[in-house]
Amino acid sequence: MTWKAGMKERVLRQHIEGCIDQVQEYVDLESAQAISSFESKAVDHFRCLDGLKAQYNTREDKISEFKRLQSEYATKVDGLEKSIEHFEKLSEEIEEFLVELEVKTKLASKRQS
């Protein structure tokens, strides 16, 4: 290899390295801008999502409240059913008592006659 050829090769390598450096700087700059843009959009989307969560979170609260009320009403219905059973038994006992009282009243009136 001659001196001129070696010199051209060295200049060519320097030129290629310069091009590589410029391409790397361009890639770094574009990457940084893309990352910054992505981060900014992600932050905006998370803010929007937080707003939507706050706006529609009541739905979960309402479901939870509905389940709680449903449980309370089921408990009250059970209590009412027990009360109804108790009063039905009491009614039967009162009817039996009235029948016995009627019989005793008839017997007492026959004795007096």
UniProtKB/Swiss-Prot annotation:
- For this UniProt record, give its keywords in alphabetical order, as a comma-separated list: Coiled coil, Endosome, Transport
> Which cell locations does it reside in?
Endosome
Q: Which residues form a coiled coil?
A: 75-108
Which is one Gene Ontology cellular component term of this protein?
Answer: endosome
The transmembrane segments are: none
InterPro entries tied to this protein: BLI1 (IPR020491)
Q: One Pfam family for this entry, by name?
A: BLI1
Q: What is its main location?
A: other
Role noted for this protein: Component of the biogenesis of lysosome-related organelles complex-1 (BLOC-1) involved in endosomal cargo sorting.
Q: Which family does it belong to?
A: Belongs to the BLI1 family.
Q: How does it assemble?
A: Component of the biogenesis of lysosome-related organelles complex-1 (BLOC-1).
Q: Per its record, how is this protein called by name? A: Biogenesis of lysosome-related organelles complex 1 subunit BLI1
What organism does this protein naturally occur in? Lachancea thermotolerans (strain ATCC 56472 / CBS 6340 / NRRL Y-8284) (Yeast)
Per UniProt, what is the name of the gene that codes for the protein in this document?
A: BLI1
